[in-house]
Amino acid sequence: WSDKKVWGFDSFSGFPSYDENDDLEKFKNLYDNKVISKEHFQDYQLNIQLKEFISGKSASPSTISSSMDFSETSLSLLEDKINYFELDNIILVDGDYKETMAENMYTDVKFMSVLMDCDLYESHKIALPFVWDRIVNEGYMYLDEYYSLKFPGARIAADEFFENKIDKPRMYPRKPMDFERWFVKKNSE
C-alpha cells in the first residue's frame, strides 16, 4: 500500500446554482470561436438530440446529465464503501467549494495527480486555482469535462484559468472515434 492520501472534495448536496456559462448554447459560441472542433460540436448536437428524444423534454444544464444534479449523492454511503474495503488513505472533505477550497484551507497539502471533475463553471472557477496552487511540479491535472458534451462552462473556466499560464491543457493521443481526454502537466511554477 501507498502512504499517499486520496482527497475527495464534494458538497454531497448536488450542483450549486448554474452560471450563464453553463448554458448549453455556449457550445455554439465555443465552436464559432474555434475553441472546439467541428467533430466535438457535432457530437454535442447528437447528444442533445438523443437526450431530448429519450426524455421527451428540452435539454438544459439541470437535465442534461444522466445523473441529474447529483443531489442524491450520499456521503455516508461513500464512507461505508471506503470502510468496507478498508481504505484508510482516503480523506473526504464535505462542503461548499467556496468554504472547503478557500485560499487559506489545506495550505500544507500537496497533490501529485488530480482528477478535476466538478462539471459546472463556478465549481471550476473555485477549484482550479485551489488545486493548481497545491499541485507539485511535474504533477498532473486531468480535466474530466474539458471535452464535455454536457457542460460547456467547464471548458470555458479551464481556458480562462490557463489563459495566462505557461502550462496549457493538452489532449492525450487518440485513435479515430476515441473520446478526447485532456490533461495539464505542471512544469512552470
Locate predicted features.
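S-adenosylmethionine/decaboxylated-SAM
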Residues: 1-189
